[in-house]
Amino acid sequence: MGIFLAVPEIIAASIAGGAEALSIAGSGAAIATGEGLAALGGITEGAALLGETIPISEAATTVLTKVPELVQATQAVTAAVQGGAGLVGGIYTALASDHPGDLPPNTPTGSASGLHPTSGYNPQGAGLNLQSVHKPIHAPYSGMALVPIPEYQLETGIPGIPDWLFNLVASYLPELPSLQDVFNRIAFGIWSSYYNAGSTVVNRVLSDEIQRLLRDLEYGFRATLASIGESDPVNAIATQVRSLATTARERELLQITAGQPLDLSRPTSALSAAAGALTEAAYNFIYDASSLPKDGFNALSEGVHRLGQWISFSGPTGGTPHYATPDWILYVLEQLNADTYKIPTQAVKRKQDELHPVSPTKKANKAKKSSSPGTNSGNRSKKRRGRSTSRSTTVRRNRI
């Protein structure tokens, strides 16, 4: 990030030799991409071959050599931030733009580049209007003669610096001044011929606070990546069901080992309550998810989703946060929302009988009842014997 420390030099060179650099490169885009530097090299080499010397100011050379490096550095920062944010479901394309820090709340937002304010910084409240450059104005600090420049010279700002970069610090670190305020301070320092103040601000803010910002971003990325594995609703539900089944199984094994009868009322009621709570939670989630967009307004086939996280993505209706839910999560929740199977009571009773046989006292009572005298039992035995005799006789007759 050393090129960021040369921002005051680039701004000053743009003021002094911007028109000359533009005439050499042909366009501002050529300056930003480095084509202007190549054109400068071609002109210099061609003049050397012809034995001539073309006077090119040092300011124009600074613009043609430093701006492409600055653009590459900002693009690298942009790619790093977008790459990290892509892992967690998207990046906000427009961050907060009004975090003045220790500046007055009426700090101007400026142009798209963030360097050209519509009305400047004036603690006395008199205001700074760059349209009227011939009017005498008060300096923002005592002892500083403010000499503003015409509007069109700062209209394009620094090529290659995106808008979100000016507000990135303010979005994640509200207690610090935003990058827009930092660059505004640098610009005011240059306009007031107080170049060293601008260099001091850049050296202090862009070296220390940007490093803090990057550390905070890295921590945020890691925390979000860790939360992805913990916020999976299907995994959470499966874990709860697995824990419930494991607890019930362990309790049943302990009772079997101790020879105690299984109390089916408590596990059944607990299972019913858990199933009811699970069904209600699944129903609420399905109801909420059904009323939310599945595509996130991002013009993709399945949308951008990270297991149902809140994301922000630009689209036809803007970049507001959406909630995207994949279809397979809804399918699993619908299956969980179905009626749970009922416990077969006969199988449970048979299992109880096998585990806990009838006690000896009950066997003795059964034996007494069966040995008690009665006519019905005698007649029943006689009938049984007679039926068997007649049947055997019939069989013999048939054989003869």
Curated annotation (Swiss-Prot):
Bias kind Low complexity: ranges: 370-379
Region DNA-binding, annotated ranges: 347-394
Ranges where the record places region D1: 307-342
Tree of life domain: Viruses
Basic residues: bias regions: 380-400
Motif (Nuclear localization signal): 359-369
Residues with lipid group (N-myristoyl glycine): G2
Signal peptide from the UniProt entry: none
GO biological process: symbiont entry into host cell; viral penetration into host nucleus
Keyword line: Capsid protein, Host endoplasmic reticulum, Host membrane, Host nucleus, Late protein, Lipoprotein, Membrane, Myristate, Viral penetration into host nucleus, Virion, Virus entry into host cell
A single GO cellular-component term on record: host cell nucleus
Region named Disordered: 99-118, 348-400
Family, as annotated: Belongs to the polyomaviruses capsid protein VP2 family.
Name by which UniProt lists this protein: Minor capsid protein VP2
Lineage per the UniProt record: Viruses, Monodnaviria, Shotokuvirae, Cossaviricota, Papovaviricetes
